[in-house]
């Protein structure tokens, strides 16, 4: 009888330990959040654009590589301000799209757009890079990646990609013009100054 009691107590203790371990593991999973993927079938799109600039890489980057210089080459009338963080440093947030600087090298940076309430998150990231080709020429590369799976169909996805490609092709052309010391034409759909 005494041995039976010891056996029952031992089994009960093991069962209790097992239950406590399971509860602890479940609590850890809950603390880490749900691991369910939000976008079941993402459709990642990459747009890679490039142009050659007739200036040395250091001169090109000095002219167009500032994080808020986007307002010049994208011709944003409202301009650009750093909302938080330090300008040109990882973690800086600019007023253009609420974009966060998430990576940088001597002649490149990568940014992302933040999640917005009520809007599907498309994981949008952009990278601007300047690479020396020769001592006097530079290749500018602008790469975008984003998920367009939330768009209704292939036609909408193609239209979206074509629109982004047009905007950033113009932006890259504007960067080249500025880096080479030129003056930008008026933005599309806006009259020239003085008209």
Regions found by a protein language model. Give the residues of each.
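Solvent-exposed, polar/charged alpha-helical surfaces in well-ordered, non-transmembrane soluble domains
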Residues: 58, 62-68, 166-173, 177
């Amino acid at each position: 009888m005494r041995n039976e009691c010891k056996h029952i107590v031992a089994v009960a203790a093991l069962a209790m330990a097992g239950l406590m371990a399971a509860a602890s593991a479940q609590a850890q999973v809950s603390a880490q959040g749900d691991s369910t993927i939000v976008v079941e079938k993402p459709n990642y799109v990459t747009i890679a654009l490039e142009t050659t600039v007739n200036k040395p890489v250091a001169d090109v980057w000095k002219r167009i590589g500032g994080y808020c210089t986007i307002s010049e080459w994208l011709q944003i009338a409202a301009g650009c301000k750093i909302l938080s963080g330090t300008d040109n440093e990882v973690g800086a947030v600019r007023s253009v799209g609420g974009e966060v600087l998430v990576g940088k090298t001597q002649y490149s940076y990568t940014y992302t757009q933040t999640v917005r309430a009520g809007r599907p998150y498309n994981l949008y990231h952009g990278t601007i890079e300047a690479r020396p080709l020769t001592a006097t020429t530079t290749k500018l590369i602008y790469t975008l990646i984003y998920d367009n799976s939330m768009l209704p169909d292939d036609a909408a996805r193609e239209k979206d990609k074509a629109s982004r490609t047009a905007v950033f092709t113009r932006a890259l052309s504007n960067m080249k013009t500025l880096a080479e010391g030129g003056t930008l034409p008026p933005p599309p759909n806006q009259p020239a100054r003085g008209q």
